[in-house]
Amino acid sequence: MAKIFGVLFIVLSLFLNIYFAADKIKTRNKDFYTVTEVTDGDTFVTNTGAKIRILGIDAPEMGLCGSQEAKDFLGKLILNKKVKISSTANDSFKRLVSDVYLDGISVNNLMVASGWAAYDSSDSLDVE
């Protein structure tokens, strides 16, 4: 009798571990989105229609010197690719301000390292 309960306990434990592991994997995949449009050097749109502004950087606004190059660089990095989004908050333009990762590498840092964006330590979410 004790052996039967022991076997049932092990089987139930394995089942629960598999169930919860699969649930964690599903939850993790919810943070990944495909980039469908790059608006400028620090903003893009995902397959869900969400507008994302990359946290902690400031790229030239469209029409200013370097703006098209910054947009093109960001596009080459992430357009039509899956990125991980770690959301922070919405800004005054209703964009989600987020850290963005491509294959585990910070897109925020790549934009600054490339020279097409500057680090922005501003705590304000109103920064355009």
Specify the residue positions occupied by each region the protein language model found.
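Small beta-barrel nucleic-acid-binding modules, primarily SNase/OB-fold domains
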Residues: 2-128
